[in-house]
C-alpha cells in the first residue's frame, strides 16, 4: 500500500513542479528561471527537484510535451469533426490562439524567450513543434483539391507557412506586450482578410 501511495505521489509532485515553472514563466517575464528560484516557489529543495527531473531541460521538455499533447489532440478532433479545408484551418488557428491566451507562461517557451541560455535541444523541440504544425496545415490544404475540387491562388506550402507565421506572430506579440495584447484580439477580422484572396 505504501509503495502504491509513493508511486501516486511522484506524478503529483512532477505536475506541481511543472505548474510552478509555467506560473513563474508567466509572472517573471524576461527573467531566466533558475532551479533555486523554482525550488523556493515549489517549497522543495533543489535536490528534491532533481529526484523528479534529472535536469532543468527535462522540466522544460515536460512543458513542451504538454503543449504538443494539448494542441495536436485538439487538432485531431477538428479533423474528425470538420471536412472543409478552410474551416479546419480556421479552427486550428483558433485552438492555438486560445491555448496561448490561457497559458501565457507556455507562450514564452513557444516564442523562444524562456529558452535563452537553456539547452539547445529545447529550441529544437519548439522548432519541431512548428514544423509539425506547418506539415499539418499543408496536408489539410492539399486535401482541399481532392475533397472539394478547389485550389488556391497561392501554393499550399506557402499558405501553410503563412498560417504558421501568423500564429507565431500572435504568440510573440503576446509575450512582447507583457500579455496585454491578447492573441484573440481582431482574430476573426484578420482571418477574413487572410482568406480574402484565397
Swiss-Prot record:
<dbReference type="InterPro" id="IPR023769">
    <property type="entry name" value="NO_SlmA"/>
</dbReference>
<dbReference type="Pfam" id="PF22276">
    <property type="entry name" value="SlmA-like_C"/>
</dbReference>
<dbReference type="GO" id="GO:0043590">
    <property type="term" value="C:bacterial nucleoid"/>
</dbReference>
<keyword id="KW-0238">DNA-binding</keyword>
<feature type="DNA-binding region" description="H-T-H motif">
    <location>
        <begin position="34"/>
        <end position="53"/>
    </location>
</feature>
<comment type="subunit">
    <text>Homodimer. Interacts with FtsZ.</text>
</comment>
<keyword id="KW-0131">Cell cycle</keyword>
<dbReference type="InterPro" id="IPR054580">
    <property type="entry name" value="SlmA-like_C"/>
</dbReference>
<feature type="domain" description="HTH tetR-type">
    <location>
        <begin position="11"/>
        <end position="71"/>
    </location>
</feature>
<dbReference type="GO" id="GO:0051301">
    <property type="term" value="P:cell division"/>
</dbReference>
<dbReference type="GO" id="GO:0043565">
    <property type="term" value="F:sequence-specific DNA binding"/>
</dbReference>
<dbReference type="InterPro" id="IPR036271">
    <property type="entry name" value="Tet_transcr_reg_TetR-rel_C_sf"/>
</dbReference>
<comment type="similarity">
    <text>Belongs to the nucleoid occlusion factor SlmA family.</text>
</comment>
<keyword id="KW-0963">Cytoplasm</keyword>
<keyword id="KW-0132">Cell division</keyword>
<dbReference type="GO" id="GO:0005737">
    <property type="term" value="C:cytoplasm"/>
</dbReference>
<dbReference type="InterPro" id="IPR009057">
    <property type="entry name" value="Homeodomain-like_sf"/>
</dbReference>
<dbReference type="InterPro" id="IPR001647">
    <property type="entry name" value="HTH_TetR"/>
</dbReference>
<dbReference type="Pfam" id="PF00440">
    <property type="entry name" value="TetR_N"/>
</dbReference>
<comment type="function">
    <text>Required for nucleoid occlusion (NO) phenomenon, which prevents Z-ring formation and cell division over the nucleoid. Acts as a DNA-associated cell division inhibitor that binds simultaneously chromosomal DNA and FtsZ, and disrupts the assembly of FtsZ polymers. SlmA-DNA-binding sequences (SBS) are dispersed on non-Ter regions of the chromosome, preventing FtsZ polymerization at these regions.</text>
</comment>
<dbReference type="InterPro" id="IPR050624">
    <property type="entry name" value="HTH-type_Tx_Regulator"/>
</dbReference>
<protein>
    <recommendedName>
        <fullName>Nucleoid occlusion factor SlmA</fullName>
    </recommendedName>
</protein>
<dbReference type="GO" id="GO:0010974">
    <property type="term" value="P:negative regulation of division septum assembly"/>
</dbReference>
